Amino acid sequence: MITVALPKGRIAEETLDRFEKIFGERFVFEDRKLILERGEFKFLLVRNQDVPTYVLHQAADIGIVGLDVLEEQESDLIRLLDLGIGRCKVVIGSPMGSEIDYSKPQIKIATKMTNIAKKHFAKQALAVDLIKLYGSIELAPLVGLADAIVDIVETGTTMKQNHLKIDEVIMESSAYMVANRNSFYEKKDKILELQRQFSKLKEVRE
């Protein structure tokens, strides 16, 4: 059996839709259930940020998770395939009508992705004070908590509604299929076959 960790929400639905197309049967979680067993697969429904943890500790053999989460957590997992779903961007944003003053001794940046932000600004040789937030990141520069934000956006609509603009795209992200290293060697044939089927389906869709 292969255990698959899925992030709650649209990515889980799109992934299960692909399983249905590949295997010709329904893969649907019962209401409020977090575990789904079907044939040779067991699916776990977890928070997006927790997918790498489940896979890393082999509670799941493979997982579906955003590249932004992988980069933020620097998880030691095998990246099998970019699924091309859940596309989004990690961006720097600041209030409309003003520019970020990079000449300041230190810029205040609000974000929940401190590792990605830290690495990006280190490459730019810029001194930043990273303020860790867990939600409503857009609020920070509007109330003087930060000069700018590093956040994840799909369309940028939420930023515009909060009078923020995108100053720079740090990285583009989409959902990846990843595997635990031990699981990969123990179940290599099955995992590679699943990767092949998903890759084939992706090519058809593109």
UniProtKB/Swiss-Prot annotation:
Q: What is its EC number?
A: 2.4.2.17
- Which reaction(s) does its UniProt entry say it catalyses? 1-(5-phospho-beta-D-ribosyl)-ATP + diphosphate = 5-phospho-alpha-D-ribose 1-diphosphate + ATP
Which PROSITE patterns would you find in this protein's record? ATP_P_PHORIBOSYLTR
Q: Which domain of life is it from?
A: Bacteria
Entry's Gene Ontology cellular component terms: cytoplasm
The main location class comes to: cytoplasm
Q: What is known of its domains?
A: Lacks the C-terminal regulatory region which is replaced by HisZ.
Q: What is this protein called?
A: ATP phosphoribosyltransferase
Q: Organism, per UniProt?
A: Wolinella succinogenes (strain ATCC 29543 / DSM 1740 / CCUG 13145 / JCM 31913 / LMG 7466 / NCTC 11488 / FDC 602W) (Vibrio succinogenes)
In the record, what lineage is assigned to the organism producing the protein? Answer: Bacteria, Pseudomonadati, Campylobacterota, Epsilonproteobacteria, Campylobacterales
